[in-house]
A protein has these predicted regions:
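Anionic group-transfer/hydrolysis microenvironments
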Residues: 108, 141, 175-176, 187, ...
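Short glycine-enriched loops at secondary-structure junctions
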Residues: 62-64, 83, 199, 245-249
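C-terminal active-site "lid" helix and adjoining low-complexity regulatory extension at the edge
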Residues: 233, 247-286
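Protein kinase-like catalytic core scaffold
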Residues: 136, 194-195, 240, 253
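Phosphate-binding site of ATP-dependent enzymes
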Residues: 145-235
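Conserved N-proximal alpha/beta basic substrate-recognition cap immediately N-terminal to
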Residues: 6-116
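A short glycine-rich, hydrophobically flanked beta-strand micro-motif that places a catalytic Asp/Glu
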Residues: 173, 184, 237-249
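Active-site nucleotide/adenylate-binding loops and adjacent lid/helix of ATP-dependent enzymes
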Residues: 2-9, 84-181, 222
Length: 286
């Protein structure tokens, strides 16, 4: 059996290489030849038929255009192009979660603007602050590892952040103070919660391990697991890292979902190798 692991052309750090090696080893152990491919390796030409035969593709990139082209030409992707798109764009993600009646923070989408105009009118920011108060969480539509997520403690800080964002799409959310610097990463594969990890960061409102947080194996309440599974299903994901916050009354609130989670830290803190679980799931669902 032959498959591809499609990865980003420009992300070549040791962290990513280690993850790719974990996946390759898991599939090789199961008799699958897993070739690592980038967009350049496959084809950049829109009107060219991609004719190499593979049994399936693990799509570990966020190149939605490539994912769509591959599916249009008959390739089976894990995760699907649509699922990756919904996770990659936070605006689409929260809209889909809201449509499915899944508990998320109160979320407001900034009006559309364009390069050169930027967000020249800021009355909408005042309107949001009047409704949900301060601090205000500001998230760019695209971003990973918490790097495009900001906390504004005043209108002045919010305006400075929006100045930096320029004309890029962003959203605003209520700040969940009860979950400051902590959340639960629930790793889901095939609509099953495989292992969960409590992530904490005492020096930041974001819990990301890449920002200095730590992790520990954790057994969440069933309602947290149920919400994570419901959210995963709503976005059509085969596997995902689901980040769940602690609400003010200890109720679960979805922070976000990741279609290609960096699970080396999960192995480090829980001893569970998600590459093995993903490999078994895919081979049982072809």
């Amino acid at each position: 059996m032959k498959a591809w692991l499609v990865v980003n052309s420009f992300m070549n750090s040791d962290k990513f290489k280690h993850l790719y090696e974990m996946l390759s080893l898991a599939f090789n152990k199961r008799g699958v030849s897993l070739d690592i491919k980038t967009a350049s390796d496959i084809s950049l030409e829109v009107n060219k038929k991609i004719d190499e035969k593979v049994d399936f593709i693990i799509f570990w990139d966020k190149d939605i255009y490539l994912a769509q082209r591959l599916e249009e030409q008959g390739y089976k992707l894990f995760n699907s192009a649509k699922a990756v798109e919904l996770c990659d764009n936070k605006i689409l993600m929260y809209q889909a979660l809201a449509t499915a009646n899944i508990r998320i923070p109160r979320t407001f989408i900034a009006p559309k603007t364009f390069e050169g105009l930027n967000y020249s009118k800021r009355d909408f920011v005042n309107g949001v602050i009047k409704q949900i108060g301060l601090p205000l969480v500001i998230k760019e539509a695209y971003g990973s590892f918490g790097e495009q997520v900001y906390l504004a403690n005043s209108l002045e800080e919010a305006n400075k952040i929006i100045d930096q964002i320029g004309y890029k799409d962003f959203l605003m959310q209520e700040y969940i103070a009860s979950s400051k610097g902590k959340d639960i990463r629930i790793n889901v594969v095939g609509n099953k919660a495989i292992v969960s990890m409590l992530r904490e960061n005492k020096n930041d409102f974001r819990s990301n391990i890449s920002n200095g947080g730590t992790g520990a194996k954790f057994e969440p309440k069933q309602e947290y697991i149920d919400l994570a599974l419901k959210a995963t299903k709503a976005l059509g994901l085969d596997f995902a890292g689901v980040d769940v916050m602690f609400g003010p009354n200890d109720e679960p609130i979805i922070c976000e979902l990741n279609s290609n989670p960096q699970f080396a830290s999960t192995l480090q803190y829980t001893g569970v190798n998600l590459a093995e679980v993903i490999a078994d799931y895919i081979l049982n669902n072809l």
